[in-house]
Every structure is written in C-alpha cells, then in structure tokens.
Amino acid sequence: MFVAIGSTNKAKVEAVKEALKIIGLNADVISVNVESGVSSQPFCHETFVGAKNRAYNALNATNADIGIGIEGGICYYENKYLAFAVVYAANKEGLENFSFSMAFSLPYSMVKHILEGRELGEATDLIFSTKDSKQHEGAIGYLTKVITRKELYIQPVIAALYPFYNKIE
C-alpha cells in the first residue's frame, strides 16, 4: 500500500506513520508539498476545506492508494479561540472520510498575534521564544508541556482511516 500525505511538515508525517503502525497497515508513506487552497491560518470551515484539498491534491500528485490531508485551524466558540485539526482521507475509488482532533483553547497572548495575521506556529514561536515549533511540539506541546503536535494528530488519522482497513457496511 502507498499513502501520500499532503504536507512535508515533520509532525504531520510522523503522526501518519505512527497511526499506520498502530493499526497495522503496512504502507509506504510519501510526503508531498501541495496547496491547501485556503489561507495560511485557516478559521473554522476553512480548516475542513484545506484538509480535503490536501488529501485530494496529494492523491492526484502521486500514484498513492490513499491521500491524507491534515489541516490545523482555529475557531471562535464561547468567548475562546480554539485550535484543532481536521484529517481527511480519500482514495481514487471515491472512498473518503474525515475526523477532528481534540480542540484546545489558546491564551490571549497567542490569539493577539493570530488576529494580527500570523499563523499559530509563528505566534507560538514568538510567545515561547523558539523556532519552527509547528514542525515539532506545536502550540499544544508548549501549552500543555505533555502533548505533542504529533500525538494530537495520531488519533484523528486513525479515525479518518478506519473505512480503508475496517470494511463495515
């Protein structure tokens, strides 16, 4: 089996590899840099659209059996800005599924930078005086000190993939 992920982000690629290992799917994984078709910091529904676009763009750019798109986004709910991700999986036969990560609230110090036009990763780097946090621990890692960005993505990758390995009508 050949799986293409529509991102070269290290945390996303490693999450897909770990998820495939957990569910026992023996697959070669390739990461491809594809367009999401949404803003660099998606909000709410844009996040879903970006994940779907990445999955299909990865599928179309390769000869993969499954294309996977992971898009991180932010949504405003109950006076809080919440960060979350959408994972979308699709194949060329028309099978598709999606899932969401857990959502977590962002402190105002980060939200302020995001509302000024920065991505969450940039805001994280500024607040925590680091570089390329989105390739590693991510905002979730710096905020919780125990959950990494890779770990945040593993469960929704598994949930998005279940129709591809657990054939239930």
Curated annotation (Swiss-Prot):
Matching Gene3D superfamilies: 3.90.950.10
Sorted UniProt keywords: Hydrolase, Magnesium, Manganese, Metal-binding, Nucleotide metabolism, Nucleotide-binding
Residues that coordinate or bind substrate: S7, T8, N9, K10, A11, K12
Cofactors (names): Mg(2+); Mn(2+)
Cofactor: how and how many bound: Binds 1 divalent metal cation per subunit; can use either Mg(2+) or Mn(2+).
GO biological process terms held by the UniProt record: nucleotide metabolic process; thiamine metabolic process
Pfam family, one: NTPase_I-T
InterPro entries reported in the protein's UniProt record: ITPase-like_fam (IPR029001), Non_canon_purine_NTPase (IPR002786), NTPase/PRRC1 (IPR026533), YjjX_NTPase (IPR050299)
Catalyzed chemical reaction(s): XTP + H2O = XDP + phosphate + H(+); ITP + H2O = IDP + phosphate + H(+)
One annotated GO molecular function: nucleotide binding
Residues where Mg(2+) binds: E35
EC nos: 3.6.1.73
Function of the protein: Phosphatase that hydrolyzes non-canonical purine nucleotides such as XTP and ITP to their respective diphosphate derivatives. Probably excludes non-canonical purines from DNA/RNA precursor pool, thus preventing their incorporation into DNA/RNA and avoiding chromosomal lesions.
Oligomer and partners: Homodimer.
Family: Belongs to the YjjX NTPase family.
Protein name (database record): Probable inosine/xanthosine triphosphatase
UniProt source species: Sulfurisphaera tokodaii (strain DSM 16993 / JCM 10545 / NBRC 100140 / 7) (Sulfolobus tokodaii)
